[in-house]
């Protein structure tokens, strides 16, 4: 018995799928222009940040970022089915990250100046859910990465982006592919929601333990003493060093850690590692296990990495190494603090967000930290490390299952969107495997 997708492919595109370049299908437009820092302090219109575009395949519309737009001012508004792209990043692999406006909105929404938009001449020809998955697929990302130029900072060339080719099957096929792929992301979302609940529990205990004004902490946890806590600016107990400037390569004798290597949980990304060849100058930037690195710009600003091992590694120029006075504060204690609400409330106020976020030493040095005695810090670290392991150990439990689901989704997505000479047989194979999986789930 044929699946619905198989029937649609056989009926509507038996000879394959047509490809078109982006310049054949639509036009690019820019983000906000002519704006000063003051325009972003109090505004009368909402705008989409760089981070919103970078982080979300489908644009998040519940935003609070505002900008002042004059009555007769000419700026580009975002429309339904538009595709937004990040314009620059530290690495080519993070350039041109896409986000699709998949919902209708009556609000005028503007785009930050570090991103740009693309609008189809005939948007009715496209299914927005299909586009959401397509522009994050391996096939499209492989093309988009090649549009980035630069050495230490990479920028997307719109002239090259215009030559990117996309498959345009009939809309009925797009709809079915979009539904199929959304089913996989929904399964992952359910698991992620469960993990998020656990992470909230960890976050609650972390913020609870770091609130030394709460006498309840001492009463319930005898090893936590709130009576002798200092509140110290980070700049008074830390030394800051900016990273090394070099071009990240696929091969080399030393890992080159970049801002994009810091995951949301403060861990080092094991994937997409880049390298350099060590020389006398770069030796000054070698890392040791337990070192702290701060992302100072871009979508990862403010995130802090606790270097997990003694792998030979150098840190890049968009990172800041934080060297703490360990007679006052433990590195691991600071790392847990750097994920707390107390830290992020300060970081979000101190960061410069007029364009791409900037969180440099003059800002981070003003972050105030509660510093109890070292013995108390050690007890807090022991408690929080146990919670952290439950939430972030990729070898077992929910994190491992979520990772497996993500890989499964990526396989199905890239297979369904390949549209090569064997596209139909690929799609049929994938759909039948999906049907068998649903049968097994119903039987279990």
Predicted regions and their residues:
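Charged, alpha-helix-forming regions
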Residues: 1-444
């Amino acid at each position: 018995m044929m699946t619905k997708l198989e029937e649609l492919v056989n009926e509507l595109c038996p000879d394959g799928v047509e490809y078109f370049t982006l310049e054949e299908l639509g036009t690019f437009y820019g983000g906000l222009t002519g704006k000063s820092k003051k325009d972003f302090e109090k505004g009368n219109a909402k705008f989409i940040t760089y981070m919103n575009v970078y982080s979300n395949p489908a644009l998040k519309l519940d935003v609070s970022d505002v900008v002042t737009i004059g009555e007769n001012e000419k700026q580009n508004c975002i429309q339904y089915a538009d595709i937004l792209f990040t314009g620059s990043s530290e690495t080519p692999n993070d350039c041109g990250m896409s986000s699709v406006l998949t919902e209708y909105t009556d609000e005028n929404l503007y785009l930050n100046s570090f991103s740009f938009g693309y609008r189809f001449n005939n948007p009715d020809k496209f299914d927005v859910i299909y586009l959401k998955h397509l522009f994050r697929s391996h096939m499209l990302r492989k093309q988009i990465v090649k549009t980035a130029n630069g050495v230490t900072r990479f920028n997307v060339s719109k002239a090259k982006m215009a030559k990117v080719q996309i498959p345009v099957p009939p809309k009925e096929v797009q709809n079915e592919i979009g539904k199929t792929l959304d089913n996989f992301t929904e399964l992952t979302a359910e698991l992620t929601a469960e993990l998020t609940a656990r992470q909230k529990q960890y976050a609650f205990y972390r913020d609870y333990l770091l609130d030394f004004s709460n006498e309840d902490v001492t009463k319930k946890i005898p090893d936590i003493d709130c009576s002798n806590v200092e509140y110290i600016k980070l700049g008074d107990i830390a030394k800051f060093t900016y990273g090394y400037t070099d071009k990240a390569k696929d091969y080399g004798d030393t890992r080159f850690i970049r801002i994009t290597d810091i995951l949301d949980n403060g861990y080092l990304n094991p994937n997409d590692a880049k390298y350099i060849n060590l020389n006398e100058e770069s030796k000054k930037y070698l890392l040791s296990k337990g070192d702290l690195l701060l992302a100072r710009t871009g979508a990862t600003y403010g995130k802090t990495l606790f270097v997990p091992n003694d792998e030979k590694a150098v840190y890049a120029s968009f990172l800041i190494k934080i060297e703490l006075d360990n007679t006052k504060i433990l590195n691991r204690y600071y790392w847990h603090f750097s994920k707390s609400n107390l830290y992020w409330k300060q970081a979000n106020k101190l960061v410069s967000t007029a364009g791409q976020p900037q969180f440099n030493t003059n800002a981070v040095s003003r972050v105030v930290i509660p510093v109890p005695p070292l013995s108390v810090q050690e007890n807090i670290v022991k408690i929080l490390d146990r919670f952290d392991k439950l939430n972030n150990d990729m070898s077992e439990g929910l994190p491992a299952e979520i990772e497996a689901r993500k890989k499964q989704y990526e396989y199905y997505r890239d297979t369904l969107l390949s549209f090569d000479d064997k596209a139909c047989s690929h799609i049929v194979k994938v759909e039948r495997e999906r049907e068998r999986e649903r049968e097994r789930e119903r039987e279990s």
